[in-house]
C-alpha cells in the first residue's frame, strides 16, 4: 500500500544517525519594529553601489548562458587589494579564496582537512555554525569552555592542555568572538598555532569593527597552519550578497579546489562583490558610525546596571539581569516591547546587534524599563 505523504516526517527518512535529533541553524525571523538579532549592518548599500551593481548586471545579462569564472580570479584580486590595504600586510590573489558566505568557506576547509576519523576544536560559546559544519562533514567537534568569570576569554593554558590531549586536526578561533564580542590577542593565537598539530582557522568575520591587528600578519610565520576567514556580510552592508573568503598560503587554495563544487560562485555574485569592493572606503564609514553607537550602548547598559562584555564587534553581549528573569524570559520581555534580540543559549546572557541610532534607543529604553520594573 502506498505511503500517505502527509504522514511522513523526518523520522521516517533514512537520515544519517549522527544528524538525528539535531536542529537546523537559524535565528527567529519575526516582524517587529527593531530587529537586532542577526548582526547585520543596518545601513543599506550606498546609491553608488546600487547603481554600479545595476550597471554590471545589465552588462552581464547577455552572458548568463555561460558559466562564471570558475576560480573568480578578478574578485580574488580585488579582495587581495582590500585585505592588503585594510591589514597593512601584502596579500596576493593567489592567497585568497572566495565562496558563498564564510560558511561555505569553512565547509570547504572542513571537507579538505576534517572528515571521518578527524576532529575540530572550538572555544565555546562561539559561532554556532562551527559544530554544525563539523557534523555535516562527519568531523568530530570537541570544545574548550570560555567562562563568564574569565570574561569569556580563551584560557590559553587550558587550551594548550586540551590540544595536547585531543590532537585536533582543525582548531577554530573566532575573533572578535561571536556571541561574546571580545577579541583574542595575537600573542594568544600564536601560542595556539605553535601547539596545533593541524590547521588553525581564525574566523575574523567582524574584524573591521576591531582595533586589534589581524591574524593575516601571522601568515608568513605559519604558512602550513594558518587560515584567516572573513566575510563581506557585516562591515560591507552585503549580507544579502553572500560573499565570504579566506586568506592563506596558496597551497590551501589548491586544497579547497579539490572539494569545491564546479562554478560555485555565480557571475552576478562575483560582479556585485567587485562593485562593493570598489567603494570600500565609503562603505566602511558606516563601520565608524556603528562603533560609535556600540560604545554608547555599552556605556548606557552599564549605567543601568547590566554586566557587558567589552565588545570589538557590531553587537553587545550582556548579563546582570538574573533578578528580572532567566535569558528566555528577558528575551521575551524585549520582544514584547518590539525589540528582537538573540538568546544564544548561554544562561544569564543575551546578545543585541547594534542598529541605527533610533533602534538602539528603543533597545536601551526597553533595557531601562526592565531594570525599573
Curated annotation (Swiss-Prot):
Tell me which UniProt keywords the record has, alphabetically: Amino-acid biosynthesis, Aminotransferase, Histidine biosynthesis, Pyridoxal phosphate, Transferase
Q: In which pathway does it act?
A: Amino-acid biosynthesis; L-histidine biosynthesis; L-histidine from 5-phospho-alpha-D-ribose 1-diphosphate: step 7/9
The entry lists its GO molecular-function terms as: histidinol-phosphate transaminase activity; pyridoxal phosphate binding
Which residues does the record list as N6-(pyridoxal phosphate)lysine (modified residue)? 234
**Known catalytic reactions:** L-histidinol phosphate + 2-oxoglutarate = 3-(imidazol-4-yl)-2-oxopropyl phosphate + L-glutamate
UniProt superkingdom: Bacteria
Q: What EC numbers are recorded for this enzyme? A: 2.6.1.9
InterPro entries the UniProt entry points to: Aminotransferase_I/II_large (IPR004839), HisP_aminotrans (IPR005861), PyrdxlP-dep_Trfase (IPR015424), PyrdxlP-dep_Trfase_major (IPR015421), PyrdxlP-dep_Trfase_small (IPR015422)
Question: Is Transferase among the key words of this record?
Answer: yes
Q: Is-annotated flag, keyword Cell wall biogenesis/degradation?
A: no
Q: Which EC class is the enzyme in? A: transferase
Q: Which cofactor does it need?
A: pyridoxal 5'-phosphate
* Record-linked PANTHER family: HISTIDINOL-PHOSPHATE AMINOTRANSFERASE, HISTIDINOL-PHOSPHATE AMINOTRANSFERASE-RELATED
Family per UniProt?
Belongs to the class-II pyridoxal-phosphate-dependent aminotransferase family. Histidinol-phosphate aminotransferase subfamily.
Q: What subunit structure does UniProt give?
A: Homodimer.
Q: Give the protein name, as stated in the record.
A: Histidinol-phosphate aminotransferase
Q: Which organism is it from?
A: Corynebacterium jeikeium (strain K411)
- The gene name reads hisC
Amino acid at each position: 500500500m502506498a505511503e500517505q505523504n502527509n504522514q511522513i516526517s523526518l523520522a521516517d527518512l533514512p537520515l544519517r544517525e549522527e544528524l538525528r535529533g539535531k536542529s537546523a541553524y537559524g535565528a527567529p525571523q519575526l516582524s517587529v519594529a527593531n530587529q537586532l538579532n542577526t548582526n547585520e549592518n543596518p545601513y543599506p548599500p550606498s546609491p553608488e553601489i546600487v547603481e554600479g551593481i545595476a550597471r554590471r548586471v545589465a552588462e552581464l545579462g547577455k552572458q548568463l548562458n555561460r558559466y562564471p569564472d570558475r576560480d573568480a580570479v578578478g574578485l580574488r584580486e580585488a579582495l587581495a587589494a582590500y585585505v592588503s590595504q585594510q591589514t597593512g600586510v601584502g596579500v596576493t590573489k593567489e592567497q585568497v579564496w572566495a565562496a558563498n558566505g564564510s560558511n561555505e568557506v569553512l565547509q570547504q576547509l572542513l571537507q579538505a582537512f576534517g572528515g571521518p576519523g578527524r576532529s575540530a576544536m572550538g572555544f565555546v560559546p562561539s559561532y554556532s555554525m562551527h559544530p554544525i559544519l563539523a557534523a555535516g562533514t562527519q568531523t568530530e567537534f570537541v570544545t574548550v569552555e570560555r567562562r563568564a568569570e574569565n570574561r569569556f576569554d580563551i584560557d590559553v593554558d587550558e587550551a594548550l592542555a586540551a590540544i595536547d590531549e585531543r590532537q585536533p586536526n582543525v582548531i577554530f578561533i573566532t575573533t572578535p568572538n561571536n556571541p561574546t564580542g571580545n577579541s583574542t590577542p595575537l600573542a594568544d593565537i600564536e601560542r595556539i598555532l605553535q601547539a596545533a598539530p593541524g590547521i588553525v582557522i581564525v574566523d575574523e568575520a567582524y574584524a573591521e569593527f576591531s582595533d586589534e591587528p589581524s591574524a593575516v600578519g601571522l601568515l608568513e610565520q605559519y604558512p602550513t597552519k594558518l587560515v584567516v576567514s572573513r566575510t563581506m556580510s557585516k562591515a560591507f552592508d552585503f549580507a544579502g550578497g553572500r560573499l565570504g573568503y579566506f586568506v592563506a598560503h596558496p597551497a590551501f587554495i589548491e586544497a579547497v579546489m579539490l572539494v569545491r563544487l564546479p562554478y560555485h560562485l555565480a557571475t552576478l555574485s562575483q560582479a556585485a562583490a567587485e562593485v562593493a569592493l570598489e567603494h570600500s572606503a565609503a562603505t566602511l564609514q558606516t563601520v565608524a558610525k556603528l562603533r560609535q553607537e556600540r560604545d554608547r550602548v555599552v556605556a548606557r547598559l552599564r549605567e543601568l546596571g547590566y554586566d557587558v562584555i567589552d565588545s570589538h564587534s557590531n553587537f553587545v553581549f550582556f548579563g546582570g539581569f538574573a533578578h528580572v528573569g532567566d535569558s528566555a524570559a528577558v528575551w521575551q520581555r524585549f520582544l514584547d516591547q518590539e525589540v528582537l534580540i538573540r538568546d544564544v543559549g548561554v544562561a544569564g546572557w543575551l546578545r543585541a546587534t547594534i542598529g541605527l541610532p533610533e533602534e538602539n534607543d528603543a533597545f536601551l529604553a526597553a533595557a531601562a524599563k526592565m531594570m525599573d520594573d
